[in-house]
Amino acid sequence: MEREISALYEPKRNNEIRIFESSDEMSTDLAEYISQVSEISVKERGYFAIALSGGPLVSFLGKLCEAPYNKTLDWSKWYIFWSDERAVAKNHAESNYRITKEGFLSKVPILNGHVYSINDNATVEDAATDYEFVIRQLVKVRTIGVSESNDCPKFDLILLSMGSDGHVASLFPNHPSLELKDDWITYITDSPQPPPERITFTLPVINSASNIAIVTTGDDKSEAVHLAISDNADGPEAPSSLPARMVQPTDGKLVWFLDKSAASSLDAENDDAFEQHREY
């Protein structure tokens, strides 16, 4: 069962919130959502440029590897990017590339030449510079779209997860990287979570996407979900320094995919605010 949320948590313009009873239901709806965005992008642009995160997010892509999607999607038009990466070798257990390769890419017929991983043979600074150069070249030929408002790359879809501290990609609370306006890709050497060196999209790039989905599960994320979503959230992190709260598309749409545990703080404040939306 999926539920849309309202009242105290009335979604902002072009924002949507979906809550699921189980991981399987979330995976099913996420697959259909990605399929629809892919089909629209291919029809309108001839390409589908999607940026992924690693970690638990990849486990929710499994339905795309099954019927009907593994046969019906035009995988030849998919172009894969990463919104962030740890500065480790591609075969390292903490590599987002490796996690995605093993859990998703190895199971679908995406062309190898359409997979743009981050250089693991360079310093973290050089890897960020290199990745921005690659993306700029693809924007020039419109494999990736371009935002009319700020000339940033306009990915068709950016899929994110959120940490219990409210971080998205490798943008962490109160970090100077949140203030970057002109860079598309940046690097950090002081991540509060290991490994310390990471490459990440900046907020202007994330917010320029046509579609953004934040997929979040677990009761350890519930307070961060509340702070990120609620207009009534208070406390020092809510207004300005919580990265997930700063994800607000410039002219695209944001969809939150939450399980019941992640949404539990929303439930606690507003038990009557939910409307049953769909049953599976």
Swiss-Prot record:
Keyword terms, alphabetized: Hydrolase
GO BP field: carbohydrate metabolic process; pentose-phosphate shunt, oxidative branch
CDD domains, sorted: 6PGL
One Pfam family this sequence matches: Glucosamine_iso
Gene3D superfamilies the UniProt entry points to: 3.40.50.1360
Example of a GO cellular component annotation carried by this entry: cytosol
One GO MF term: 6-phosphogluconolactonase activity
SUPFAM superfamilies: NagB/RpiA/CoA transferase-like
Reactions it catalyzes: 6-phospho-D-glucono-1,5-lactone + H2O = 6-phospho-D-gluconate + H(+)
Domain of life assignment: Eukaryota
Enzyme Commission number, as recorded: 3.1.1.31
Pathway the protein contributes to: Carbohydrate degradation; pentose phosphate pathway; D-ribulose 5-phosphate from D-glucose 6-phosphate (oxidative stage): step 2/3
Function: Hydrolysis of 6-phosphogluconolactone to 6-phosphogluconate.
Alphabetical list of NCBIfam families matching this protein: pgl
Protein family: Belongs to the glucosamine/galactosamine-6-phosphate isomerase family. 6-phosphogluconolactonase subfamily.
Identification of the protein by name: Probable 6-phosphogluconolactonase 2
Organism expressing this protein natively: Oryza sativa subsp. japonica
